[in-house]
């Protein structure tokens, strides 16, 4: 029983340690989600935790939303074969 608990704890730890992080990206433009209030930022945190993103925490870093705890399925900046096209 103790072995099962240890294995479960290790799997949870690996999931937390190996979780994806990066800048949130707009899939249609290829640009990062921008922000102005550096550090703790409610908008970035809300965007990162949104159902379609699945992150655990977000904050403003270098004037863009940085997310932690993202699932592998969530795209982050830069997108392959797509550069940021500001028009």
Curated annotation (Swiss-Prot):
Name of the featured protein: Toxin Cll5c
Q: Where is the LCN-type CS-alpha/beta domain?
A: 20-85
Keyword DNA-binding part of the UniProt annotation: no
In terms of domain of life, where is this protein from? Eukaryota
Which GO molecular function, any one, fits this protein according to its record? sodium channel inhibitor activity
Name the cystine pairs: 31-84, 35-60, 44-65, 48-67
Propeptide regions on this chain: 86-87
Tissue-wise, where is it found? Expressed by the venom gland.
Identify the species of origin.
Centruroides limpidus
Q: Name one GO biological process term.
A: defense response
């Amino acid at each position: 029983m103790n072995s099962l608990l240890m294995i479960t704890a290790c799997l949870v730890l690996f999931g937390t340690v190996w979780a994806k992080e990066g800048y949130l990206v707009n899939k249609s433009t290829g640009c990062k989600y921008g922000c102005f209030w550096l550090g703790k930022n409610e908008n970035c945190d809300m965007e990162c935790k949104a159902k379609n993103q699945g992150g655990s925490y977000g904050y403003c870093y270098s004037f863009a939303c940085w997310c932690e705890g993202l699932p592998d399925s969530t795209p982050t900046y830069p997108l392959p074969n797509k550069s940021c096209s500001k028009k």
